[in-house]
Curated annotation (Swiss-Prot):
GO cellular component, one term: proton-transporting ATP synthase complex
Catalytic activity, reaction form: ATP + H2O + 4 H(+)(in) = ADP + phosphate + 5 H(+)(out)
Gene from which the chain derives: atpA2
Residues at which ATP binds: 177-184
Feature: compositional bias, Low complexity: 546-556
Similarity annotation: Belongs to the ATPase alpha/beta chains family.
Xref: NCBIfam families: atpA, PRK13343.1
Membrane topology (UniProt): Peripheral membrane protein
Residue segments, region Disordered: 514-556
Subunit organization: F-type ATPases have 2 components, CF(1) - the catalytic core - and CF(0) - the membrane proton channel. CF(1) has five subunits: alpha(3), beta(3), gamma(1), delta(1), epsilon(1). CF(0) has three main subunits: a(1), b(2) and c(9-12). The alpha and beta chains form an alternating ring which encloses part of the gamma chain. CF(1) is attached to CF(0) by a central stalk formed by the gamma and epsilon chains, while a peripheral stalk is formed by the delta and b chains.
Protein name: ATP synthase subunit alpha 2
Length: 556
């Protein structure tokens, strides 16, 4: 039935009246009281505020001029507020208001491939994040009943780690060692190796130089899958407050994917600098110092952070969040305060030794001090069987090698152990960005156990490792799980002597030709290293994708 003009006008009036009523319902009919605080003093990124007795711990406070901070400690008369922006414009008597909200960070797929600060603000020159999803940076760790056993391996592609110190999905494995021993390199190799997996990687940089972060981003863009990585960066030049919240923000970003049944990996580089920042803030806010001037809650701060890494039960989607925190030691002192705290919190540690690093063993993993407490249950059965005696044989070799410095060996059995140990050391010495598949690792270890590698020079192990994947692919049919056929793998390991002879012949031919091929390869490697080390020290934006892809390795 067609409406008359009068009926149409009445309907429009009714809609207008409904809109006006809705608008008026939001209008306060009486003055609204809002607590207003004042800055008493400000220095070193900390503002002491009075007049906000009802403020909550970790609540976001806003200063006149737009600067924000969060309540760090609550006293009777003053609140210490950690500033998240440069404190320019914040001075005594500046007005401060509450927001009633806690710190949150944007989360979601829109962050993949981006470089952001702990508040989600882009640092890569890209567009602002188009996501409305946020999570608090402080979230409770999953309860015991919500967790499941760690049963799946997180493949790093590094033979010594996968074979001896397996990391499981949902595990917390500490990477610890002196300065410049390859801690970040080992963690980045683990990230790069996820380029063919279903793991989302989050790299958190705390207090690092912008040039160092730039090199990490370039390495991931060049060798890994940057479209499945997120970089949360709080460089050394930013406010201490941003450095303090960075690891918590990184975990929240990763938990978004874990809670949806996916798998995530968080690398925190590094918690030693985070502990120093926490000590700095505590001393500035007059908290009582404890051992090594750290406040008494430093253990709790790191424990509540790392406990958020977990393997969730199937009822909650079965997702996992693995953590690779990094810590720095001073002169190899693992008994210092922060290292002992982190070792007791995590599920194991990979200890890097400066003497091994100086001896050109990369990664410089100390086999005697490293351990993985839960990852062994997640190790692939074929790899577990192949690496059964590896640790014992290598430990015996290191002990025998120390004695051989005082004289020669006449016992044939001891000479055989030395020979085997030299091949083991050559196997576990692995260049960066040369990840091995689990299949490659199993065949190499089986060939080692069968004595196939004993007759070859240790110098030929590296070219053998490079040519092994294509050799295996040509001889193995592509079933769904080629690691299940143990008999076929054992036969391949025993017949690898064919490849060994070919590698030895090629090496002899190059030596006869004057080593031109090696010189050319060294020149190319030096060019890549020089390109990798270059860059603006003040910018952390990655290099353009076109330049990064030009040197990308062939995918296997």
């Amino acid at each position: 039935m067609t409406q008359t003009p009068d009926a149409t006008g009445a309907a429009a009036d009714a809609r207008w009246l409904a809109r006006r009523r809705g608008a008026l319902a939001c209008v306060a009919l009486a003055p609204v009281a809002q607590a207003l605080g004042r800055v008493e003093r400000v220095a070193d990124g900390i503002a002491f505020v009075s007049g906000l007795e009802d403020a909550m711990l970790n609540e976001v406070l806003r200063f006149d001029g737009g600067v924000t901070g969060f309540a760090h400690t609550l006293d009777e008369d003053l609140i210490s507020v950690v500033l998240l922006d440069p404190d320019a414009g914040v001075q005594a008597q500046t007005a401060v208001t509450r927001t009633g909200a806690v710190l949150e960070v944007p989360v979601g797929p829109q962050l993949l491939g981006r470089v952001v600060d702990p508040l989600g603000r882009p640092l890569d020159g890209g567009a602002p994040l188009g996501t409305a999803d946020t999570l608090p940076i402080e979230r409770p760790a999953p309860e015991i009943i919500e967790r499941d056993l760690v049963s799946e391996p997180l493949d790093t592609g590094v033979l010594i780690v996968d074979a001896l110190f397996t990391i499981g999905r949902g595990q917390r494995e500490l990477i610890i060692g002196d300065r410049a021993t390859g801690k970040t390199s080992l963690a980045i190799d683990a990230i790069v190796n996820q380029r063919h997996s279903d793991v989302i990687c989050v790299y958190v940089a705390i207090g690092q130089r912008a040039s160092a972060v730039r090199r990490v981003i370039d390495a991931v863009r060049r060798y890994g899958a940057p479209e499945r990585c997120i970089f949360v960066v709080a460089p050394a030049a930013c406010a201490p407050g941003l450095q303090w919240i960075a690891p918590f923000a990184g975990f929240s970003v990763a938990e978004y994917f874990r809670d949806r049944g996916q798998h995530a990996l968080v690398v925190v580089d590094d918690l030693t600098k985070h502990a120093a920042t926490h000590r700095e803030l505590a001393l500035l806010t007059r908290e009582p110092p404890g051992r090594e001037a750290y406040p008494g809650d430093i253990f709790y701060v790191h424990a509540r952070l790392l406990e958020r890494a977990a393997k969730l039960s199937a009822k909650l989607g079965g997702g996992s969040l693995s953590a690779l925190p990094i810590a720095e030691t001073d002169a190899g002192n693992l008994a210092a305060y922060i290292p002992t705290n982190l070792i007791s919190i995590t599920d194991g540690q990979i200890v890097l030794d400066s003497a091994l690093f100086a001896a050109n063993q990369r990664p410089a993993v100390d086999v005697g001090l490293s351990v993985s407490r839960v990852g062994g249950k997640a190790q692939h059965p074929a790899l577990r069987a192949a690496s059964g005696r590896l640790r014992l044989d290598y430990a015996q070799f290191l002990e025998l090698e120390a004695f051989t410095r005082f004289g020669g060996l006449t016992d044939a059995r001891l000479r055989a152990q030395i020979t085997r140990g030299e091949r083991i050391r050559a196997l576990i010495t692995q260049p960066r960005f040369r990840a091995l598949r689990t299949l490659d690792e199993v065949v190499l270890l089986k060939a080692l156990a069968a004595g196939v590698l004993d007759a070859m020079s240790p110098d030929l192990v590296a070219p053998l490792r490079e040519r092994l994947p294509s050799w295996l692919d040509a001889r193995l049919a592509p079933p769904r799980d080629r690691l299940a056929d143990d008999a076929a793998l054992s036969m391949l390991a025993e017949s690898i002597g064919e490849l060994v002879e070919r590698v030895a012949a090629d090496a002899a031919h190059r030596a006869a030709a004057g080593g031109h091929a090696e010189d050319a390869a060294d020149d190319m490697g030096g060019a890549l290293d020089g390109e990798h080390a270059s860059g603006d020290a003040t910018s952390i934006a990655p290099t353009p994708p076109g330049g990064a892809e030009a040197g990308a390795p062939r995918k296997r």
